[in-house]
Regions:
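Non-cytosolic coordination micro-motifs
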Residues: 27-140
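N-terminal leader/targeting segments
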Residues: 1-17, 126-140
Length: 140
């Protein structure tokens, strides 16, 4: 990518009322010997965010392999800029010992008018919940 980050697997965006409300960036799941690569990517994001927004409101000093727990995520850095929150998480998968980062960029300045779900959106949401449930049930 243009900022020198190598491990991005996916970028998802969420909109409400045509406003971008959330960006989710997720890395590939990689093995323990490459945790440094994940941290390096996160630090590149932090450098870029800091240039744009100033220092994070929270940042961990260093990451130790012992801080990872199966199936859990922890905050590596967080920015609070007005209505915007940027959270950088590191985590370990529960089923296999693989590690990843996630970055959430959220904008809380939601439009005031309440969004009424269309039938299509309702069905879509039900389908997603059902899929998530099936994935959970089939993964054990």
């Amino acid at each position: 990518s243009s900022i020198g980050v190598n491990n991005i697997a996916s970028i998802e965006t969420e909109f409400k009322e045509n406003e971008l409300t959330r960006i989710n960036i997720e890395s590939y799941k990689i093995t323990a010997n490459r945790i440094d690569d994940l941290v390096r990517d996160c630090n590149i994001f932090i450098r870029n965010f800091t240039e744009k927004y100033g220092n994070p409101s929270y940042q961990k000093d260093k990451v130790n392999i012992s801080e990872f727990n199966s199936g859990e995520e922890f905050e590596y850095a967080k920015y609070q800029i007005g209505d915007k929150t940027i959270t950088i998480l590191l985590g370990e998968q529960s089923r296999e010992v693989k590690f990843y980062y996630k970055i959430y960029i959220e904008n809380d300045k939601f439009p005031k008018k309440k969004h009424v779900q269309t039938e299509k959106e309702k069905k879509e949401e039900q389908r997603r919940m059902k899929e998530a449930k099936e994935i959970k049930e089939n993964s054990f």
